[in-house]
Swiss-Prot record:
UniProt key word Glycoprotein: no
GO molecular function list: 5-amino-6-(5-phosphoribitylamino)uracil phosphatase activity; magnesium ion binding; phosphatase activity
Cofactor: Mg(2+); Mn(2+); Co(2+); Zn(2+)
The protein, known as: 5-amino-6-(5-phospho-D-ribitylamino)uracil phosphatase YigB
pH dependence: Optimum pH is 6-7.5.
Superkingdom of source: Bacteria
Organism: Escherichia coli (strain K12)
Cofactor: binding details: Magnesium. Can also use other divalent metal cations as manganese, cobalt or zinc.
Catalytic activity: 5-amino-6-(5-phospho-D-ribitylamino)uracil + H2O = 5-amino-6-(D-ribitylamino)uracil + phosphate
Binding site for substrate: D16, L17, D18
Binding annotation for Mg(2+): D16, D18, D188
Length: 238
């Protein structure tokens, strides 16, 4: 544990999910593979559909709806819906197909192997402070055993713009009824988590990714209050 700024009073903790509480890389790789297979098998006209086609459609959807990137679930839905429209399905069929694809996506997205260390750490921390999850993604903690640790979960899109925008940080403080400066946000991303939290008035803990090096960042404004390499280190703050 390394300290870079004076750590003040802590009345609550907020957490990023992906790559902070578990390794999200294998989850996403498997989910994207299964999601593509589902779309390809959904209709004969989509048999040759590839991830490159999805990326092209995602870009087109974002150009038409610039703010949609804040809601990754809606963005994916609209992209798949457009793929089905392009394949010749009716508007009703495309909407139904996109909904089915998203149900399949959510199923695979929630098959996450959470380390026991994460469970043990969150359990201890939750005895001391209220915990909140703040995510730009579409993981659902209640589906992979983490839901009970959190007072609530905030997701970009339904609860505001994505991090590093301040919407969800401000909303967390409001819902917790805690001064924002007394909240410690924990995350792996120096921009969305550390930078976003600090610019919103929170304290920030950077959980350093493998091979991460704070000294390689060019933006000194991203300096966290503290840096850890293991989630369990947070229990020393109790």
């Amino acid at each position: 544990m390394r300290f870079y700024r004076p750590l003040g009073r802590i009345s609550a903790l907020t957490f990023d999910l992906d790559d902070t509480l578990y390794d999200n890389r294998p989850v996403i790789l498997r989910t994207e593979r299964e999601a593509l297979t589902f779309v390809q098998n959904y209709h004969p006209a989509l048999r040759s559909f590839q991830n490159e086609d999805l990326q092209r459609l995602r870009q087109a959807v974002r150009e038409a709806e610039p703010e949609i990137y804040h809601d990754v679930t809606r963005w994916r839905f609209r992209s798949i819906e457009q793929a089905m429209l392009d394949a010749g399905l009716s508007a009703e069929e495309a909407s139904a197909g996109a909904h089915a694809a998203m149900i399949n996506f959510a199923k695979w997205r929630s098959r996450i192997d959470v380390p026991q260390q994460t469970h043990d750490t969150l359990k201890q921390l939750a005895k001391k402070w209220p915990l909140v999850a703040i995510t730009n993604g579409n993981a659902q903690p209640e589906l992979f055993g983490l839901g009970d640790y959190f007072e609530f979960v905030l997701r970009a899109g339904p609860h505001g713009r994505s991090k590093p925008f301040s919407d969800m940080y401000f909303l967390a403080a409001e819902k917790l009824n805690v001064p924002i400066g007394e909240i410690l946000h924990v995350g792996d991303d120096l921009t969305t988590d550390v930078g976003g939290a600090i610019r919103s008035g929170m304290q920030a803990c950077w959980i350093r990714p493998e091979n991460g090096d704070l000294m390689q960042t060019w933006d000194s404004r991203l300096l966290p209050h503290l840096e850890i390499s293991r989630l369990a280190s947070l229990t020393s703050l109790i």
